[in-house]
Swiss-Prot record:
InterPro entries: Com_YlbF, YheA/YmcA-like_dom_sf. Belongs to the UPF0342 family. Coiled coil: none annotated. This is UPF0342 protein stu0643. NCBIfam families: PRK13676.1-1 (NF010209). HAMAP family: UPF0342 (MF_01526). It comes from the Bacteria. The lineage of its organism: Bacteria, Bacillati, Bacillota, Bacilli, Lactobacillales.
């Protein structure tokens, strides 16, 4: 049997070789070269992290926070570079979700 860590490292290399991953890297690089998109991306990710942290802590978002999420989402959707990045991220997440399901299958079987 192969070493589990070798398999994990091989999986990492496989993910990096996926066309969807390479496309996502290209989209991220395009954002980095555009000041407006880069600033909006940072604002979006910072807000998203804060929002999720509050949710995990059991704090429900206020009406103002919900409105801010919608407003920020509209700004992101209006920016072509960010919209392309999020679409590419979604494409890669299909693979990652499938991989996660496969990896955790033995643990799920133990709980059944």
């Amino acid at each position: 049997m192969r070493n589990i860590y070798d398999l994990a490292n091989e999986l990492e290399r496989g993910i990096r070789a996926l066309p969807e991953y390479k496309n996502l890297v290209e989209k991220k690089e395009a954002i980095a070269t555009d000041a407006e998109a880069s600033a909006l991306f940072k604002e979006f990710t910072d807000f998203q992290e804060d929002f999720y942290a509050k949710m995990q802590a059991g704090t429900m978002p206020t009406a103002e926070e919900q409105a801010a999420v919608q407003e920020l989402g509209q700004k992101v959707e209006a920016n072509a570079l960010l919209k392309e990045y999020l679409t590419a991220q979604q494409s890669l997440s299909v693979y990652l979700n499938d991989i996660e399901r496969i990896i955790f299958k033995p643990l799920q079987e133990l709980n059944n």
